[in-house]
Every structure is written in structure tokens, then in C-alpha cells.
């Protein structure tokens, strides 16, 4: 079972072949595989370390105790387990390595680990070990520590909160109408959360979470790599689909996504973090009056996302669709916003469709193409897509599609033209089916950070 997302208490994993049907097999497997750890012993701690990819070293040199060291590239957790002792006698020491290789401590995090063991709160202890291990694995090196990045992000979000609090006067106003209140180590769980919205006496919050940062390549988010296990089903003899091995990874820094299920943090708020990641091609889609001016963050710029082979480019513009900006749109939009984000994240497949919807003759020249997406909010969210070959700016080379996301999440092609001529309803219907299929294909999202060269 997936973690709850922003707009429902429980979000079930859907069947890929039938999105309207809950995948109960997957649900039960997930439930069985998520049985909480509760073994407070030497073997239990060893199991927990191996489960989350930490190295384990055991020191039994002293007769009455065993010292376990759970080690990553940055973190070191020393757990002293006395023989025949209670959980209250177990000691935990947490240390981190800095860029120079020296150790430093985090007394707050260490105390949370100790308290969880002392109170036999094994689920909380496991969550915190998992969080530490994940951030450790996500750090490409000691010099590029996600723990340091998170500290910088926390400072930025706290500065934003204090600036908004001085303007809006009350904490409640910042939570309801501002950009939220950051909370560190909320309810004993390590990490940074943002309380950002209240509705019907419920306070919504999200945890910032990093996942598997790579050791290679330039900093970017990679969307749509090896999405298809086989070529798509041919819908028409006029469509010449590219094979899987022709898919090219597309780097983009449109959004910094920490956890795809929960919250997409507006890029204005993570500018210091992006700077540390050496990601500089940042765009602010609209002039935000609140903290972009307060903190001197950039207002507007144009961003182009280039293919690795440098022969293609993608330009993305539109609104910053974050949970805390939903107050700007009618209430029925939240369900539809996920549909919009799904379309944007599927733009590799969208480009494949557009490259093949013209004719087989042009398939060879598809390596010099550009896709421009824009998002609008009217009665329904609107996606405006414009496709053309690079260096051919005349109207005869353009394909323009206007898609709307209906209240039930279905996509509707409102308008489609090729070479300035509107296509027939039948042609638009075929395209709509192709687009709908892409929403059922899983996404591979990775975060790349530039290597540190000594």
C-alpha cells in the first residue's frame, strides 16, 4: 500500500492494466513486506542494518557487552548492547563524517534514536535508521552529503517562514495562506516536514525525502528512461514507432522531486539546495510576490532542457504546481493536477508520439526536434503542447495540441493541428488513445549530481 498522498487518507496502488481496479495482490504483498521490525537484540540490529544496506561490524572484546557498528559512507551508529540487559541499558552513539573526513555529532538525532530504544518504540527506531541509511546512500560522496544539503534547505525554509510570519502576523495564516511552517524531527521521526495547509480540522504535512542520488553524470532529474519493455501497439499503419533502444535519457531540472507521491516543492524554496547541487538552469514560472522578492530569489527566466546527445532540446514553461499553491485554483482541481503532472513527466513518450504521428519519412529527422509544454488553469487544467523540428520555424513543421484534464482525471484533446491545419476528430481520437496509454506506463526518476573532482 502506498503512503497516503495529499488528498486522500489512503492511496491504493492501481492495476497497471486497469487503472480503475485496485491491485489487491500488490497491496497484500506490500502489507506483508512491511511488517515492522521489533527485535531489540544483537541479531535484530544486524538484521536491520543489512535490510537498509549498512555495513555491520561487531566488537565482542568486552565480556559483558557487544558493540555493533552500523556504517555507511557518512554515518556511523554505534550500539552498545549489554548482555542480558533491558532496552533501557542499550546505548546509541551517532556520528557523521564531514567533507574533511572528520567526525561531528548531532545530539538531537542521537537522542531520538536512544529514546526510541528506551521506550521500545521499534517502528520509530526502524524509520529513523531507514531515513539515515537512505540519505547516506543518496549522498554521492562525503563532500556531497545530503545531510548538509538538507541543513541548507532547512535554513532556507525557516528564513522563508520567519519572513512570512512577520508579514502575516500569525502562524495560522502562514500555514493556511503562506508557504508553510518547517518542522524538524516531527514527532520523533528524523527529517524535515512542512506543515502547509489545514482543512476540516486536519493539518496536512509532507516529509522531504531524497532517493538514490547517482555517482555519475551532470546534475539533473532523469525522466522516462527505458520506460517501455516492448514497442507500443501500432494504432495505425501511418505510425512508425521507434524501438526501445532508440529512447534517449532526457535531463531536466524543471522540478526537484524528493518524493513523487507526496509533494513537489516549489523551486523558489530550494534555490540554495540547487546551488549546492550545481543546478543553475532554474526557472520561476510566474512572478511570485511573497518570498521570491523577500529573499532576492530570481523572478523569471527561460529554461531549455537539452538531450544528452545535444541534438534535441525541450523547453518547459508553466505554473509551479505545488500543494501550497492550490488555494489559487478551484477546489475540484487537486485531483486533476496529478493528471497534469503525469502528462508533463511523460513528455518523452509524448515526443515519441509526435515524432511518429507525422509520417515514416520524417522519422529519420526526428533527432532534431523540440517540444514546448505550457500549463494553464481555467475551468479545467489545460496543457498546451507545441512540437516542431529545430531550425525549422515555419508553421508547416508545427504540431499543436491542446489537452484538458477532466474532473475524473480523463484526458480530452480539445484541439490538434499539423502544419497550421486542424486535424479531424478521428485523428485526434487516435492521438488521445495514445496519450492515455502513456499514463499507464511507469516512470523511472533518478537524480544525478556532478562528481566532485579532487
Curated annotation (Swiss-Prot):
Write the record's keywords in alphabetical order, separated by commas. Activator, Nucleus, Transcription, Transcription regulation
Q: Which residues form a coiled coil?
A: none
> Which is one GO molecular function term here?
transcription coactivator activity
- In the UniProt record, does the keyword Amino-acid biosynthesis occur? no
Organism domain of life: Eukaryota
Query: Which InterPro entries does this chain map to?
Result: Mediator_Med1
Major place of residence = nucleus
Please report the name of this protein according to its UniProt entry.
Answer: Mediator of RNA polymerase II transcription subunit 1
Native organism? Schizosaccharomyces pombe (strain 972 / ATCC 24843)
Amino acid at each position: 500500500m502506498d503512503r497516503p498522498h495529499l488528498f486522500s487518507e489512503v492511496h491504493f496502488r492501481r492495476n497497471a492494466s486497469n487503472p480503475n481496479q485496485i491491485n489487491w495482490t500488490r497491496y497484500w504483498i506490500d502489507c506483508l513486506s512491511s511488517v515492522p521490525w521489533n527485535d531489540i537484540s544483537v541479531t535484530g540490529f544486524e538484521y536491520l542494518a543489512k535490510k537498509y544496506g549498512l555495513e555491520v561490524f561487531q566488537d565482542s572484546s568486552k565480556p559483558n557487552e557487544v558493540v555493533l557498528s552500523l556504517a555507511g559512507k557518512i554515518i556511523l551508529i554505534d550500539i552498545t548492547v549489554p548482555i542480558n540487559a533491558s532496552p533501557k541499558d542499550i546505548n546509541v552513539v551517532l556520528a557523521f563524517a564531514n567533507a574533511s573526513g572528520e567526525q561531528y555529532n548531532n545530539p538531537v538525532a542521537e537522542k531520538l534514536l536512544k529514546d526510541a530504544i528506551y521506550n521500545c518504540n521499534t517502528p520509530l527506531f526502524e524509520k529513523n535508521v531507514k531515513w539515515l541509511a537512505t540519505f547516506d546512500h543518496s549522498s554521492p560522496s562525503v563532500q556531497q552529503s545530503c545531510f548538509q544539503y538538507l541543513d541548507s534547505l532547512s535554513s532556507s525554509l525557516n528564513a522563508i517562514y520567519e519572513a512570512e510570519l512577520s508579514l502575516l502576523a500569525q502562524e495560522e495564516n502562514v500555514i493556511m495562506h503562506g508557504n508553510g511552517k518547517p518542522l524538524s524531527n516531527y514527532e520523533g521521526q528524523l527529517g524535515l516536514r512542512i506543515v502547509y495547509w489545514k482543512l476540516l480540522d486536519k493539518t496536512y504535512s509532507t516529509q522531504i525525502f531524497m532517493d538514490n542520488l547517482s555517482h555519475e553524470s551532470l546534475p539533473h532529474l532523469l525522466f522516462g528512461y527505458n520506460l517501455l519493455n516492448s514497442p507500443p501497439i501500432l494504432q495505425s499503419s501511418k505510425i512508425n514507432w521507434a524501438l526501445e533502444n532508440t529512447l534517449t535519457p532526457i535531463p531536466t531540472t524543471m522540478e526537484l522531486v524528493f518524493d513523487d507521491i507526496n509533494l513537489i516543492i516549489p523551486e523558489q524554496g530550494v534555490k540554495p539546495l540547487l546551488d549546492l547541487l550545481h543546478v543553475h538552469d532554474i526557472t520561476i514560472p510566474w512572478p511570485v510576490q511573497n518570498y521570491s522578492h523577500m529573499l532576492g530569489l530570481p523572478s523569471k527566466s527561460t529554461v531549455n532542457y537539452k538531450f544528452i546527445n545535444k541534438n534535441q532540446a525541450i523547453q518547459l514553461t508553466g505554473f509551479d504546481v505545488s500543494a501550497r499553491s492550490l488555494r489559487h485554483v478551484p477546489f475540484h482541481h487537486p485531483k486533476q493536477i496529478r493528471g497534469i503532472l503525469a502528462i508533463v513527466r511523460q513528455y518523452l513518450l509524448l515526443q515519441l508520439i509526435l515524432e511518429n504521428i507525422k509520417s515514416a519519412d520524417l522519422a529519420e529527422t526526428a533527432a532534431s526536434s523540440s517540444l514546448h509544454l505550457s500549463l494553464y488553469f481555467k475551468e479545467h487544467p489545460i496543457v498546451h503542447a507545441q512540437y516542431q523540428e529545430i531550425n525549422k520555424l515555419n508553421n508547416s513543421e508545427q504540431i499543436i495540441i491542446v489537452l484538458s484534464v477532466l474532473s475524473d482525471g480523463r484526458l480530452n484533446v480539445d484541439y490538434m493541428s499539423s502544419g497550421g491545419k486542424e486535424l479531424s476528430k478521428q485523428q485526434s481520437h487516435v492521438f488521445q488513445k495514445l496519450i492515455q496509454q502513456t499514463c499507464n506506463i511507469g516512470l523511472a526518476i533518478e537524480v544525478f549530481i556532478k562528481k566532485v573532482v579532487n
